[in-house]
Amino acid sequence: MFFSGDPSTRKRVDLGGRSTKERDARKLLEQTRMERNRRLLQKQQNSAALKIQKFFRGRRSMAIERSKVRHDFCETYGNNCQNVDRHCFEPGSSFLRQFLFFFKAQNSGDFVILVETCRLLQSFVDSSGDIVSLFSGLDYSSEHNLVDFRVKKLAFTCIEAIHQNRNRLRDQLLVTPEEASISTAILMEAVSLLLDPKLPWVCKIVSYLQKRKVFKLVREMVTTAKESPRGKTMTGNILSLERVLILIVPHIGREPCCCTVVDPRWSFSSMILTIPLIWKLFPNLKVVFANPSLSQHYIHQMASCIQKDTCVLPMETSPEFPGYACLLGNTLDTANVVLSQPECSLDMAIDIALVATFFLETLPPVKSSEGESRQGSSDEDDMLIDDVPGLVLNKALEQQITNAIDSRFLLQLTNVLFRQVSLGMQSYDEDKEALAIGTASSFLYAAFNTLPLERIMTILAYRTELVAVLWNYMKRCHENQKWSSMPKLLAYLPGDAPGWLLPLVVFCPVYKHMLMIVDNEEFYEREKPLSLQDIRLLIIILKQALWQLLWVNPLTQPNTGKSVSNDLSKKNPIELIQNRMGIVVSELLSQLQDWNNRKQFTSSSDFQADSVNEYFISQAIMEGTRANYILMQAPFLIPFTSRVKIFTTQLATARQSHGSQGIFARNRFRIRRDHILEDAYNQMSALSEDDLRSSIRVTFVNELGVEEAGIDGGGIFKDFMEKITRAAFDVQYGLFKETADHMLYPNPGSGMIHEQHLQFFHFLGSLLAKAMFEGILVDIPFATFFLSKLKQKYNYLNDLPSLDPELYRHLIFLKRYKGDISDLELYFVILNNEYGERTEEELLPGGQDMRVTNENVITFIHLVSNHRLNFQIRQQSSHFLRGFQQLIPKEWIDMFNEHELQVLISGSVDSLDIDDLRNNTNYAGGYHAGHYVIDMFWEVMKSFSTENQKKFLKFVTGCSRGPLLGFKYLEPAFCIQRAAGSASNESVDRLPTSATCMNLLKLPPYQSKELLETKLMYAISAEAGFDLS
């Protein structure tokens, strides 16, 4: 960089190992290559410049020539065509030749000439009535090539002129033929004249228009026009633009039409049917499109594009009006007409279902007009799918889609699809049957995920043969051990998808919906809708399918909730279906188990999986495992005793986590025996949720105000829980009522007795939960419908017998009444009678003036049962549940059905198992299993009545009911200890005593069986608190 002082030039040494010659050769080659590329680029630029110059010169020459021709035209025919006569349209005239050559839509003068030309055309046709001779002269056949070229060019020029000036003519685009003075009306009527179906050139014009993307031009005109004030206040008259479409649409290439088939991207389906609510704008076009042959053509065209995975929808759609949703709504709007035709084929129904399925899969979930989601009811949380963020359909478009898939559409579609597999047919085509079943299932599955579910379910359950057809198909496949694979038109299903997957995922929710209205006589006696033998087979099929999905081939990451991301349906539809499948099959099996519990028609073990072992149970306790997922999703697959073990393990873990405080930190209650409910309420209500989970120690105070003897090691608390539950749930106190079979449920009129009745219900919920939390069984027989509320389940008509069998019989009488129900003079009101106070309550707004008729009797029945089962006790049940869930989470309770839940609360109704108690008894103080006193004791115990056995159990354990799983699980184990050293007179005069906290019986060595029985009976019947201890 800087001068070093040495002027000599030193030789540079290249250490790269290459000679200078080699380096120079490489450099030369690189320079040559660059020079060659430079010359090539220069050549391309010169060529491009020449083309641009040539194009420019051509356009300039064309413009000059066009201007010259325009000048000559105006000189000859006038600026406003004032020199034109009818012969100007003939082949020999230069009028059309010159005009079509120089016409430019953006030129205002040219546009005026075009309008005047079309006005003259209409005038000449009106006067002569023969448009063919107007264009061809005397002989059309000899001049048809020229004439055809001119008329198709003229027709397109009229449409193009309006399209190019659509923004300027925004308010004139949607005009009627009667508005003859408006330029757009004149142009469109000229096109209509040229498209008369009787004319010989009509197919050539339509083919030319379609090649020039006429439907795209019309779409853009309509889109512009709809923004104008006129577009928002349309009359019912036919529009000129609509008339043109009506004349073009029937040209679908079938005889006698000879039009070429248009590219689907620019077809009527892609360009016009994707216009939002097009039938409101063009109602007459709807009538034309509803023609079976036209609809079949366009719907088949859409179905073919879907199967080829070809995107033909326009891109310039708004989020509120996506093209696929508009196409779906407009297509389904006319599908009823097609499906109602006697000649409607299976292929046509399949195409309609395929198109509807594809676009329904893409839609975000649609809400019903009442604002409810697809589910229809709060409990029916089948198929919840999260809304797609930022994608909200326009309300009118939503309404169009939901109104289109109505009862008539569903009925007609299923009838056509199942026509070949009707229940009465002896022979059937297996391939057609699989095709029909697969198509119907895929469409309905997509509809369930998108549309308001309650309305669809009601239609399918009560107005179609869907359940019977699907069941016969599944039954036959199961018996033959051959499931047909779903047809190839269901592109999102992999080839190895089980054939039962889609039919079952549709069958289950529909059949479950049917069971909500079926009464006991229909189900058990009439065996409708399925026979009991079929139901037994159905249970086997459902159980096998569910076990296959949840255990054998489970999802990688099962969704434990019932909400499934809509992204999943796009990324992995098969996973979404499998997840959905697990939910609906579980729900149906659970409902069938409820029916079996009401009146057994199959063994309870039929609902249980065969592969549940101790390893499975150990896995089920751990969160995140497959076994734990099965426990939450389908607990009935696991035997009851295994679930009880899991439940008791969960309780023990929870107690251990809250029982680590020292003895001085425990909650202590001082309870007066004659004020047990009042004291328990005041002291227990003051505890926090955490304190409730901790140990509670009780000291009883007798009637004299003296504390009873005994230190509470758990036994006194058990006694307290048994006595407080007996007092609190006593119907005499007024918080609960009894059904006819002495089952308890909240008193609807509790507020008339206790001002703080809701707080008491919260307390009672906590009290019951505390008993279950501590593993104490209490004798409280709840009505089945009320136990459902602990599981947060909604009660339906079939739950009514557990509350009011008499009312249930009356409602079923109404349901089956053959005469005119209005003659019974019933109204939508219900009579409440609480403590002699009679009040009327409307079941619907204005119900006192709404008579019950044959049309609305089912609604009346459901409203009455809902009022009695849910509405009347909703506040009491809600507060009870809040208190209950302070200690017992919902997921623990969901493992059990209502009948099992009653066993969890109260234990088995069977008598005490003395042999089980004997096999799990320890001995101390000199006693052993073969001691003569012990032998006498067990003989006495077996001779006791069930009531005395319960008294004994309460005497030694503090609770009159044994452990759920038997005395093996009694902690600590029951023990009999010798109470005195010898059989002296003093010792045998003593009474047996107990230590309930240790489950210990102190038994003196009585000499005779009679004496032992007398002393033991006295001790267990004294009810002397803990003073005997």
Curated annotation (Swiss-Prot):
Where do the IQ domain residues begin and end? Answer: 45-74
Task: Tell me yes or no: is Mitochondrion among this UniProt entry's keywords.
Answer: no
Question: Region (Disordered) spans which residues?
Answer: 1-20
Q: Which keywords are on file for this protein? A: Transferase, Ubl conjugation pathway
Composition bias (Basic and acidic residues) maps to 8-20
Active site: which residues? 997
- SUPFAM superfamilies assigned: Hect, E3 ligase catalytic domain
EC numbers listed for it are 2.3.2.26
Per the database record, which ranges form the HECT domain? 688-1029
Recall the GO molecular function terms of this protein's record. Answer: ubiquitin protein ligase activity
Pathway of action = Protein modification; protein ubiquitination
Q: Pfam families from the xrefs?
A: HECT
**Highest taxon, organism lineage:** Eukaryota
Q: Catalysed reaction per UniProt?
A: S-ubiquitinyl-[E2 ubiquitin-conjugating enzyme]-L-cysteine + [acceptor protein]-L-lysine = [E2 ubiquitin-conjugating enzyme]-L-cysteine + N(6)-ubiquitinyl-[acceptor protein]-L-lysine
User: What GO terms in the biological process aspect are recorded for it?
Assistant: protein polyubiquitination
Provide the family line: Belongs to the UPL family.
Q: What is the role of this chain?
A: Probable E3 ubiquitin-protein ligase which mediates ubiquitination and subsequent proteasomal degradation of target proteins.
Q: Supply the name of the protein.
A: E3 ubiquitin-protein ligase UPL6
Organism annotation: Arabidopsis thaliana (Mouse-ear cress)
